[in-house]
């Protein structure tokens, strides 16, 4: 196990097949045409995962961040589940597909500059901050805001948006499509639209 004073960097240009890996103080950079395939990856103690344009990461179980860790995705990222703990960040610059849930309820943050597609639930909490950039999209079945801060300049589409009764805020400057909205806290509509469904 590494310590913060001797942090290492791993560059992946080929394919890394992994089963179950927990990494401390490690920067993983997946270069163009590089791939990570496996089941489970945990990043902790300021570790980072950077996926460059043209690179892929595919995990059949989950990707977990713990203790100031960061995921920067400019390629293609696919996992069944993702967990972001306190002060962890998902920076999505291209395409992230999560086939089950994204749990940031311990204070993880999401900065979306691409397409983030979660088949089931995005869970947030009071310390969480979500930013969806112009011409970008976040899609999920259920969005549990639970007191978080949400800023939307792109498109967000959910079956259910639930503020969780914990306050929080939603600043919408573009498009929010939601069938069932349980609003609470502050909802600020600025030159945008909140509608039940998107017109074809």
Regions found by a protein language model. Give the residues of each.
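Extracellular beta-strand-rich, repetitive "passenger/adhesive" scaffolds
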Residues: 1-200
């Amino acid at each position: 196990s590494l310590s913060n004073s001797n942090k290492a960097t791993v560059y992946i240009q080929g394919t890394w097949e992994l089963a179950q890996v927990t990494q401390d103080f490690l920067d993983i950079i997946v270069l163009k045409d590089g791939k990570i395939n496996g089941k489970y990856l945990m990043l902790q103690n300021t570790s980072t995962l950077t996926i460059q344009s043209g690179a892929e990461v595919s995990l059949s179980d989950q990707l977990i961040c713990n203790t100031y860790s960061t995921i920067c995705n400019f390629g293609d990222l696919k996992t069944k589940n993702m967990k972001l703990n306190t002060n962890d960040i998902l920076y999505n610059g291209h395409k992230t597909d999560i086939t089950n849930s994204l749990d940031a309820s311990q204070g993880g943050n999401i900065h979306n500059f691409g397409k983030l597609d979660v088949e089931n639930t995005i869970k947030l909490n009071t310390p969480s901050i979500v930013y969806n950039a112009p011409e970008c999209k976040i899609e999920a079945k259920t969005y549990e805001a639970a007191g978080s801060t949400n800023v939307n300049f792109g498109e967000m589409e959910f079956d259910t948006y639930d503020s969780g009764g914990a306050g929080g805020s939603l600043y919408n400057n573009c498009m929010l499509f939601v069938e069932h909205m349980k609003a609470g806290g502050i909802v600020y509509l600025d030159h945008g639209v909140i509608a039940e469904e998107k017109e074809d």
